[in-house]
């Protein structure tokens, strides 16, 4: 084990080439969708980092690159001090044992022909566990940890025989059966009933304490991120625009985009007076992105010099960084057409 952050991402990019249409055949320039564009972040051991943003922000793509479901266009990922540049089969197998992912829709990610036992046992067999009693013990233990008790009631069921919450618990059990260091959860509660969501979030919290897991929690829902995560990284059109402690980012958002997201979170208090921050325009074309700050065309506080600024993260409060060139106190209503 090395010292320092468990995960370090440096200058990560993911560009998708755009297929040319007939009128573009004579255009020699290749265009790209810059889904993830030069982001860097660190995740400490035992930390839960939330990746927040609306659809198209690049948060899910970032998670999939870290777990190596997609290959980055460029950049470096370092896990426990080891850069993931080597492409040997042994390195990939070791990495997949240490980093696991939970997906948004458990029904689509569970093989309908596998019962619960086979679903959870498969990763063990792939990684060389052959002893049947050992496999049975670990499968049962993981079901119990995922709070499907008694495990014997679920071992021989198929996905269609389970509720949505039970399927997600099976997916979690499969994710922890190899005892990974890192768990990446991509919108794990967005398709569940509200009554079940808190149970799954509390389960993730207990897994962190019990197994010492480090997690990256991907979601558009700031309320669940605030409840679960230690820090939040807010993404917009492939860039991290703000990162900091979860409570501070929610209470004192420094970037206008974060302020828009926070203002949209429902609060169960009829007397609570929230800041009203809204945007009217749709996100810009991801192929032809605006110069400077990418939020400028939609930003209610945009000024004339925003179009020429860079995307550097500046520390605005202790351990809270924003890519906006203005401080919270300096933000004023838009003065450009």
Regions flagged by a language model, labelled:
Residues 75-84, 95:
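Conserved ABC transporter NBD signature motif
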């Amino acid at each position: 084990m090395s010292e320092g952050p468990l995960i370090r991402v440096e200058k990560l990019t993911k560009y998708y080439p755009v297929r040319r249409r007939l009128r573009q055949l004579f255009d020699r320039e290749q265009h790209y969708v810059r889904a993830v564009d030069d982001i860097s972040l660190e995740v400490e051991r035992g930390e839960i980092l939330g990746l927040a943003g609306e659809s198209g922000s690049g948060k899910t793509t970032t998670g999939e690159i870290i777990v190596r479901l997609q290959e980055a266009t460029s950049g470096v990922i370092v896990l426990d001090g080891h850069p993931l540049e080597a492409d040997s089969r042994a390195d990939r197998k070791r990495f997949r044992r240490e980093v696991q992912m939970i997906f948004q829709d458990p029904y689509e990610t569970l093989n309908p022909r596998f019962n619960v036992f086979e679903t959870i046992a498969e990763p063990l067999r792939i990684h060389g566990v052959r002893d049947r009693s050992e496999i049975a013990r670990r499968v049962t233990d993981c079901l119990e940890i995922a709070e499907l008790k008694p495990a014997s009631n679920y071992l021989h069921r198929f996905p269609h025989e389970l509720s949505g919450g039970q399927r997600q618990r099976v997916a979690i059990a499969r994710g922890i059966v190899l005892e990974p260091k890192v768990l990446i959860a991509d919108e794990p509660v967005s398709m569940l009933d509200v009554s079940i969501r808190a149970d799954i979030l509390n389960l993730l919290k207990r897994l962190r304490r019990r197994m010492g897991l480090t997690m990256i929690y991907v979601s558009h829902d700031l309320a669940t991120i605030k409840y679960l995560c230690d820090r939040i990284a807010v993404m917009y059109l492939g860039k991290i625009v703000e990162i900091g402690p979860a409570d501070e980012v929610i209470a004192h958002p420094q970037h206008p985009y974060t302020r828009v997201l926070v203002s949209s979170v429902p609060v169960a208090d009829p007397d609570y007076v929230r800041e009203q921050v809204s945007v009217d325009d749709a996100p810009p074309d991801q192929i032809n992105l605006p110069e400077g700050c990418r939020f400028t065309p939609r930003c209610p506080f945009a000024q004339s010099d925003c179009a020429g600024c860079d995307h550097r993260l500046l520390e605005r409060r202790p351990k809270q960084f924003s890519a906006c060139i203005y401080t919270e106190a300096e933000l004023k209503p838009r003065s450009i057409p």
